[in-house]
UniProtKB/Swiss-Prot annotation:
Cytoplasmic face residues: 1-87, 136-160, 272-277, 348-360, 444-463, 517-538, 596-630
UniProt-annotated stretches for the region Interaction with RAB4A: 616-624
Other comment: This protein is the target of psychomotor stimulants such as amphetamines or cocaine.
Ligand binding (Na(+) 1): G94, V97, L434, D437, S438
Source organism phylogeny: Eukaryota, Metazoa, Chordata, Craniata, Vertebrata
Disulphide connectivity of cysteines: C200-C209
The UniProt record lists the keyword Transit peptide: no
Effect of inactivating the gene: Mutant mice are born at the expected Mendelian rate. Knockdown results in loss of serotonin uptake in synaptosomes of brainstem and cortex, abnormal barrel cortex development, enteric nervous system hyperplasia and reduced peristaltic reflexes.
Name of the molecule in the record: Sodium-dependent serotonin transporter
One MF annotation (Gene Ontology) recorded for this entry: nitric-oxide synthase binding
Reaction(s) catalysed by this chain's protein: serotonin(out) + K(+)(in) + Na(+)(out) + H(+)(in) = serotonin(in) + K(+)(out) + Na(+)(in) + H(+)(out)
Amino acid sequence: METTPLNSQKVLSECKDKEDCQENGVLQKGVPTPADKAGPGQISNGYSAVPSTSAGDEAPHSTPAATTTLVAEIHQGERETWGKKMDFLLSVIGYAVDLGNIWRFPYICYQNGGGAFLLPYTIMAIFGGIPLFYMELALGQYHRNGCISIWKKICPIFKGIGYAICIIAFYIASYYNTIIAWALYYLISSFTDQLPWTSCKNSWNTGNCTNYFAQDNITWTLHSTSPAEEFYLRHVLQIHQSKGLQDLGTISWQLALCIMLIFTIIYFSIWKGVKTSGKVVWVTATFPYIVLSVLLVRGATLPGAWRGVVFYLKPNWQKLLETGVWVDAAAQIFFSLGPGFGVLLAFASYNKFNNNCYQDALVTSVVNCMTSFVSGFVIFTVLGYMAEMRNEDVSEVAKDAGPSLLFITYAEAIANMPASTFFAIIFFLMLITLGLDSTFAGLEGVITAVLDEFPHIWAKRREWFVLIVVITCILGSLLTLTSGGAYVVTLLEEYATGPAVLTVALIEAVVVSWFYGITQFCSDVKEMLGFSPGWFWRICWVAISPLFLLFIICSFLMSPPQLRLFQYNYPHWSIILGYCIGTSSVICIPIYIIYRLISTPGTLKERIIKSITPETPTEIPCGDIRMNAV
């Protein structure tokens, strides 16, 4: 779909002799640039691969039609690149495949029609998630900047998008790593002969504790709780010591030590940049697949496993008539692939200029979706086993959602398997590695953005800046480490970050497609890859993907989730608080627009035109090439 960008630039042929065209983002005609002086064939921006000539000048040589010319490099500051292509792929896969793939997708799938849910999920992936994923990779790879400074080359007035992304990343780091700390606490507790959540004889247990798998005959009542439930609620979270958000209680020193250890690992994994994090992900991104394979085989051999699989995949086609199913499918694929968080921009900016990001987008998206699907078998074979042992329906066993599905239901199932200690250790180690590489990615998005925006301050002080970021995240996590920390985690996840990142992604998609222009963007992709995106991608970027995001946002606003955790109903003021926290990030966008218009000289029309016109052309790093079909 051809659209006329609102900040369209003059094409080279429209510039008259000796006219200054550099302001419009193209080469001056007849006036040599510094890069021209550096040697023949070198270029200084990203808008031409053929030397331009002034009116009346004779072309130095003719280029045969339908051939591809390779253009030599320009000289600019060296930018770090990935050591290997697999470093990049594993980092992107590790970022996209996170804890949500393990607990959220299986739960949403069975709740929304089982196998029938795969249809809306696939449709939303093809028309919404994957196009946005591809767009961010291409933007980052072409412009080679983080999520703040990249907007100078796209549409400067929307630079506030980058600041909003950084604030959202801080909020996510404030609660996401607490979940990893819970998993670490479980891992440490697993190094015993008998897992502590198998018995009702511990100091934290109550009189209601009832062991399903006890040898003696037991009576289960409405007030009965399992050992795994009491271990999670009363020992790990200590949630019984909190009355709610109005009284969070004290900080758990055990969880505080766990999160300190988590952030220490994070610091030494990312402090040197992608050269170090690219090596760490060879472990953190591959280990979960080894564990998932082991757990899948083990689960398939358990009695009653087939009951869980049938419950997971049995299609209920009537569900597809409900709007909520399509909303859940759209939200799941968006948050699973993760466009709009600035991470894909940052990771792709360290690629070589002519790296095939189109292929990367397809491969990593398919791997992510397949991981979610396979994780459902890992979870539901075990839930089927639990239902068989309890002599209950699978729906009764699978009523837990979110982290509780992993830390209560799945943990209890593991505890009652043969070799339970071994399976507990590898399972919680898998959860930790899944969380770590997602955190690596989230913080790298912020670090790259700030270092690119303020290179004169932080370029040679990366280690110190990373330390500041890590300490800030630890301080931001303190509320989630209290007895009522789980309430804070849920509030931040549902209201403070979800709607905000959807809004940011929507604005980003509209700006790239309609202000920067889909024609210009596709031209950029062609320069990198040698081929232009087809009509399917153009239509998705211009219309379908923005509508996809708008659909999720409107559905959320019309039917906001009713927050309830365990037996606690969130007060109304907490919902307002959540919206305020979310708005605190998105508000950066209009604030920067106002600042830009006020600080730019000229009439209002001149200010607007200058503010939506790219400030600087994009250059390619030394050693890379552009591919232009002439």
